[in-house]
Amino acid sequence: MKTLRNSTLLTSAISLLASINIAASETTIPVTAENFSHAETARNYRNWAAQGANKGFVIMPGLPPRGKAAATVQMNDDTLYGSAIVEAVDCKVTFSIPETDNYFAVQVVTERGHGQQYVVEDGAYNLPVESQYAFLIYRSGTENGIDAAKANLGKVDVTDFNFATSYQVQPYDYDEVEKWVKKYTQEVNSMDNFTYTFPRTSKDVTDLHQWNLENAAGWGGASPEAFVGNKYANSSKMKAGTCYTSTFNDPENKFFTSITAYDSDKYLMEDVRSINSHMWDKNSDGTVTVSFNCGENAKNNIDTQGNDFTFTSRHYGVNPTVINSAEDPIISAVKAQ
C-alpha cells in the first residue's frame, strides 16, 4: 500500500467444529492462570479452523458478526478481516502484503496469543515466530468502502502461506476456558480505564495477571509501536440510559482512531455503529466530541440500542504522545451529562 507506507460464514463454520481433530493427547488439559493465554489462543484457533483457516485464506464477506457468532472477542468495525493458520518453517512464517490504497496490516499471533509481528507496508515477509503454528490476521481498512476493502483482501498471494493442515485443536475443556474468560472480562469491566500492553513474546510478559486480562477481553491485539502498531483501552461498564460524552484533542495517529461499543462480554452489538477519524465531525476549535446515547442530533453519537455497554478506543499507527499518556485520552475525558 504505497499511499500508506509512512454472520454467514461463521454460522456454517460452527457445524464443522465436530469434524476438527482434537490433539492426540487423551487427557483434557486443566486451565490455570499459567496456561490461560495458551488455552484462550487455542479456543480462537479452533474457531477460525472451523472456518477453514488452517487450509485456506478465509476472507470475511463484510463487517464482523454481532454477539458470540463472532469467532473472536472485540473484533473491530473499521476493517475487514482475512485470516490463515500457518505452520512455521525454520521458525519463520512467510506472507506478503499487496499494494493497496487503504489501511492494510498483517499481524502474526503465536500460540500463546502474542502478536509477535505487526507490519503495515506492502512487500514480502519471512519473519521469526516463537511457536510451531501462527495465526495471520489481515486487516483491510474500510475507509474507501466495504467492497474496496474486500477486493484488496482478494489481492493477497495465498501461495505464500504454509497452511497448517496438520494443526489439531488443543484438548482443553472449552466450557472451562469460557468461565475463565468471563471472570477476567468482568474484572476488566470494573476498571475505569484498562490499557492493553500486548507484549510481543512470552519472555516479554512481566505481569501474568495483566496479560491474562488482555487475552480474555481483547485477544489478538497489537503492541503499541509508534506510528506502526496500535494502542487500545477499554472503558468501564456504562449505562444505556445515561448520555455520556467525551471531548478530546485529535490524537493524530498515523492511520486512524476509532471508538467502538461492545456488550459486557466484549462482542459487537446489533445495529450499533462505531465512530472513527475518517468520518467524525470535529468541533470548531479542532477538538472532537464523541457521544453515547445522547440522541440522533448529538455530535458523533453512538446509540447502543438500549444496551449497557463498554467501549474501546483504538489508536492505529499510534502517536507517541498516546503511548506515553498515563491514561487513554478518550476514555479519561468521558463525562455523564
Residue spans of the language-model regions?
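Intrinsically disordered, low-complexity peptide-like regions
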Residues: 4, 19, 74-76
